[in-house]
Amino acid sequence: MSSNSYDPARNEYFEQFQGSHQGIARFFSVNPNSCGNPAHFKEYLLCNAMSDSLTGMGVTHVLAQHDDEGNPTAILGYVTLKASSLLYRTESGYSGKPALEISELAVNQQFEHQGIGRLLLDYALFCCREIQKSAGVMYLLVYAEPQAVEFYSHVLNFEKMGDLYEIPNEVWNANCVPMLLKFDMLASSEPVYPSEDDDEEDA
């Protein structure tokens, strides 16, 4: 098997991005044909993931390969989550619904076409369910790259937002497409993702 093949039995699991990932983050790259700003995703890992975590702006979770000693050797993909709000217009102004936002999601181009994107989405849903046990979360939100709209629509039935709704916007994703998923749509769906405790049989 190629070293660039996804294999959950080969010490590949999710963990929060931390200092031990900084060295391998420089080898992360996104296929330029998959989005409009591929350099952004590497830059985010190298320059912003740690600071966002420390300041409470967002938490980045990486799917990483590890050696036999548990040291990360490659980042297959990552997803960054942050608290957000689904804003909607009313006669008196704006109101909001509690939400979790996928502010970053990227797959290393060395590991494309192996289901990594779906694993990242499933992990985001798992986190959403865990948060919902102690806090209100009604929607999962994302600003999708135009090239990724079909992926979000078909994989988990995300919908484009109408003119009635908004997500707090950022400069870099001004050309992206705001999409939403009502959380209870997936209440009966059980995400499957690799963890450090998974054994070969479970994988």
PLM regions: where:
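Non-catalytic substrate-recognition and accessory regions of acyl/acetyltransferase enzymes
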Residues: 1-114, 119-141, 145, 149-203
